[in-house]
């Protein structure tokens, strides 16, 4: 191993690389080594670079307490030899002054007197250097705010805003974060959010903004009821700060938000992702933040009954929520006590106590992301359906409760069972004796409630049957016996159970024939028998007999609903046979019958089935209409799983017609209710897939990526390949939009691996192309070339000339990268692209396909233009005195010839004018200024008057760009740009 001292250039290169490394101890260690190596060279400017790099590394890490040593050395070097500092390093030194007081405040071991002294030192040095006092007042404000001195803070804040901004002022984004945070402290949430708006909108950004603003905005948004924005800020913001070691305070804001919005499970996952945050002591202030929100979260878990649950905490110990609560509160209090002792007041510990004591802001704010384990009990539906009873009964008035229950039963309302149960409980509490009919109803409805547990349900049905018999209601008694046999038959699926059901049905049929049972009772029993039996050839005929019977008795009491039930079952059987067109009409008729019967809540079932079927048939309008109707009519009758399914179907239908904002809302609801129904892996993953796609199309890539990343494990485990491919495709696009091309390429390639086995290869080819594009953006030219080759082979096999031509051109450009073949291979790829386009153009022309021919003509022309660009860009020099061998002139002449070929092939429009301007620049570089000017004036004449109005991306925007470039060509060629009046006079 060589011990040779690295050269200065090697160290400079290493410093550049070190600045781009992830924050943390590893980067700091390299920065420390580079200082030693730079010092050994004796090169003072290089040593200054290394020291500044070390200061930055410490400042943006968990070792902020080490910041002061290299800074003190820099300051000493400045005081001793200011001439060693050039303008940039002098600026950097004064810039870092601002950090010192803030870093001192965060270290309780540094006396307050030293901090105040440093603040005066900063003011003195800034004055000597001629800088504005804006940064000084900002430092004064930070000290006062930390100390809880409101009057001093308000005065410093006002002075800060009044002072001029200069080169030493904090960046706009950081300033606005501090100003908004103060407004939150003062209880002015809306004002804070207005202050932060330019940062949130991307007008002002920096290395740590909008990261901090997104975290700080969470609780103000929730307090103001702006829950959708809060959710979006969490999904977007946590993604930004998760990999950054220095953002412990912002991460704490996300944990706090989750703890106070019913997302405790999500908060636990965030804690688990940052175990070092419990032990990194270099920044006591953010350590206290982390401990405080950990304590807050543990308090919530204990309050929810999860005190003995295992939770992530400091390494080396198995923690329960209760134990971590005690630890976090104790350690946070110890840190705050150190601050209080330093500051001479209890401002820090008071803020800590207030933070720990915070209560939930909302019961549950669905985030759309998958929590690996739920902690809270399932929530009730948000909007229960109105009960049929006009006036709620007194809970101890048995007579009123019975009347309410009868009214609900007469209305066939789904709340009838609960009403009978309430009446029964009230009778027991008050010792009220009930008659046989009421006791029968109570037992009957209790059996229905326990239907899936035959051991409980059957005795209740038997009791109800006896009571109905005693009350002189033989039809109801027989119907109860059918229900008992039905419950057993469904659970056991045995011949004996089916025989018992047959016997009960026969008994009920005899009663109906004798006029002692209703058609409704018989129809219900008949349908039950058909549902229990194994599918058979006679089912269709039997169903038609039931429907005919129900139609015959349709005018009898409550028979419209029974007819609807029969038609719904018929529709299910029809769908199973594959006749989806017929069953759609049957579901629609069943829903209408329920509405005619005045029982819209029962229409929810056929409406839901119709919605599902319509979505499968790509009938998105019917799917949307039916899902909305089912959600409206289902009300309390819908459980979490059915509610989740309907919201997701509705979301998918809305997304299919481009209503992505509303689709995202319903997909979010679908994911939430799937979680409540313990269906996260199945239904929840589908909802999150729909949500991720809708968010992506809405331009919310960070939220989309976060949602899709949490959905993918479930999709891979429990869903078909089509959904997995779609999820990875959308995730790849989201990551691409977030400028994470390497990660995007990984998703595209994983999706392509699945799609390669499909019979239809279109998706495989597109995914290979997308992967290649992302690999190229990531600087992985070799891998990109392989992916483009893969895509090209697929396009060729599918006889798709347009994407094949584009893939060949992309491969050609890659050849200019080191190790990728160079210009000769690039020319060959462009020539192949031109040949493919020419052959396809000839075929389209011969076939009389004008649209295809026009498209291919544009691709051929574009290939010629790009060939010229490739040749010119690969040329190391330009025509002129330095072009001693004439190679540059030859390359530019060839590039011009390619551009002229493109101009002759392109039709009128932006593509041809772009080629014309390319030719103009080349003419100018070749010294043919008159020819260049002539081309430029032709473009000006073409676009004269078209650059007014419209947006930047429209025709007016293109016209403005072309006119501006043409005038630049004229200036470059040494001519005055022609104004409108000269163009009109014929000078163009």
Predicted regions, residues:
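Residue register of alpha-helical TPR repeats
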Residues: 9-12, 49, 89-96, 134-138, ...
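Structural register within alpha-helical repeat arrays
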Residues: 10, 14, 34, 54, ...
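Structural motif corresponding to the intra-repeat A-B loop/turn of tetratricopeptide repeats
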Residues: 21, 41, 61, 109, ...
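C-terminal non-catalytic interaction modules
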Residues: 278-425, 429-437, 742, 869, ...
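TPR-repeat structural position
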Residues: 24, 44, 64, 150, ...
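Residue signature of alpha-solenoid helical repeat architecture, marking inter-repeat boundaries
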Residues: 5, 45, 131, 170, ...
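Amphipathic alpha-helical segments of tetratricopeptide repeats
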Residues: 32-39, 72-83, 119-127, 157-165, ...
